[in-house]
UniProtKB/Swiss-Prot annotation:
Gene designation: norW
Family of the protein in this entry: Belongs to the FAD-dependent oxidoreductase family.
GO MF entry, a single one: oxidoreductase activity, acting on iron-sulfur proteins as donors, NAD or NADP as acceptor
PANTHER family membership: NITRITE REDUCTASE [NAD(P)H], PYRIDINE NUCLEOTIDE-DISULFIDE OXIDOREDUCTASE DOMAIN-CONTAINING
Catalytically driven reaction(s): 2 reduced [nitric oxide reductase rubredoxin domain] + NAD(+) + H(+) = 2 oxidized [nitric oxide reductase rubredoxin domain] + NADH
InterPro entries, per database record: FAD-bd_OxRdtase, FAD/NAD-bd_sf, FAD/NAD-binding_dom, NO_rdtase_NorW, Rbx-bd
Alphabetical list of NCBIfam families matching this protein: PRK04965.1
Record-linked Pfam families: Pyr_redox_2, Rbx_binding
Cofactor(s) listed: FAD
Name this polypeptide is given: Nitric oxide reductase FlRd-NAD(+) reductase
Top-level taxon: Bacteria
Principal subcellular localization: cytoplasm
Length: 377
């Protein structure tokens, strides 16, 4: 059995793993190393900080010191890991090194910033640290441009709009949430955003940003431009794989792991947003929780495979909340859409009339768990 576990990272995945390990073993040596402060906060809250008037420090739930004391840990905050010597089982920073028996990479994912001229003017909201760096600018901004119409983009667009700001959202696609669902399914939310006053620039492309005396000039395709006070990149996340790559691990979109969360090195595991589990990157809370439960067992000597059930994804748009599950992005499904004043139920079925995906909104969200049970594993 392992007698020394080192975890690189301090986010939701790392903390879930620590809690699950400590439920089973109170004394095994645990060391966490991370580049941030290691204070705990709820990352989904970042989608609502502006309308709720929260400062970055308001998000803190537990300090690093309290976490270390509660779970009997050695913590090394504000520490950049530079290398992993997989053969010697050593993790290195500029001024320190740690021996491990088992190593877990929980390095998360970073916000992708489109490579356009002036990209340094774009803000990202992927961590408490990032919000702390730009909270004054965002609070003071009257005009906000959000680049990207996916999950995070529409959540932020609604939140900034609810806070009374003039919001423009730009995306290359013809509809919002284009990578998740067809336009006929997302149209209810798209209409609500427009009703609220969000200016949607779909089938549009950001070409560059330039600082001006009165704000930021965003140049778009088709000889268009708009001036705003802040620009937020919400164009997706990229798993942090640089450290794993330097350690010689197999990398695809994320750090490749099998059903046991094991990488191509038998003593190194990966968990959370940085991990690609049997070809899938799953940056949502429920698969991370289930993965942490399984990995804790395996680090303590078990051999338990991860089995993920059909899972709900919740879109945090309070004016028109949505839950979805299954293969909503499949192009070959027939969608049966029932829309009422209280909400929508959209069912995606295959050629054999088997339910493969669904999207529910508002008061109809209470039907989600019944539908979830009918989805194939």
């Amino acid at each position: 059995m392992s007698n020394s576990i080192v975890i690189i990272g301090s986010g939701f995945a790392a903390r879930q793993l620590v809690k699950n390990i400590r439920k089973q073993d109170a004394s095994i040596p645990l060391t966490l190393i991370a580049a941030d402060s290691m204070d705990e906060y709820n990352k989904p809250d970042l989608s609502h900080v502006i309308s709720q008037g929260q400062r970055a420090d308001d998000l803190t739930r537990q300090t690093a010191g309290e976490f270390a004391e509660q779970f009997n840990l050695r913590l090394f905050p504000h520490t950049w890991v530079t290398d992993i010597d997989a053969e010697a089982h050593v993790v290195k920073s500029q001024n320190n090194q740690w021996q491990y028996d088992k190593l877990v990479l929980a390095t998360g994912a970073s916000a992708f910033v489109p490579p356009v001229p002036g990209r340094e003017l774009m803000l990202t909201l992927n961590s408490q640290q990032e919000y702390r760096a730009c909270e004054t600018q965002l609070r003071d901004a009257r005009r906000v441009l959000i680049v990207g119409g996916g999950l995070i983009g529409i959540e932020l667009a609604m939140d900034f709009c609810r806070a009374g700001k003039a919001v423009t959202l730009i995306d290359n696609a013809a509809s919002i949430l284009a990578s998740l669902m067809l336009p006929e399914v997302s149209s209810r939310l798209q209409h609500r955003l427009t009703e609220m006053g969000v200016h949607l620039l779909l089938k549009s492309q950001l070409q560059g940003l330039e600082k001006t005396d009165s704000g930021i000039l965003a140049t778009l395709d088709r000889q268009r431009s708009i001036e705003v006070d802040a620009v937020i990149a919400a164009t997706g996340l990229r798993p942090e794989t640089a450290l794993a790559r330097r350690a010689g691990l197999t990398i695809n979109r994320g750090v490749c792991v099998d059903s046991y969360l094991q990488t191509s090195n038998a003593d190194i595991y990966a968990l959370g947003d940085c991990a690609e589990i049997n070809g899938q990157v799953l940056p949502f809370l429920q698969p991370i929780q289930l993965s942490a439960m399984v990995l804790a067992k395996n680090l303590l000597g078990n051999n338990t495979p991860l089995k993920l059930p059909a899972m709900l994804v919740k879109i945090k748009t309070p004016e028109l909340p949505l839950h979805l599950a299954g293969e909503t992005q499949r192009q070959d499904l027939r969608w049966q859409i029932n829309t009422e004043r209280q909400g929508m139920v959209a069912r995606g079925v295959d050629d054999g009339d088997q339910l493969r995906a669904f999207v529910v909104s508002e008061d109809r969200m209470k039907e989600a768990f019944g539908l979830l049970k009918t989805l194939p594993m």
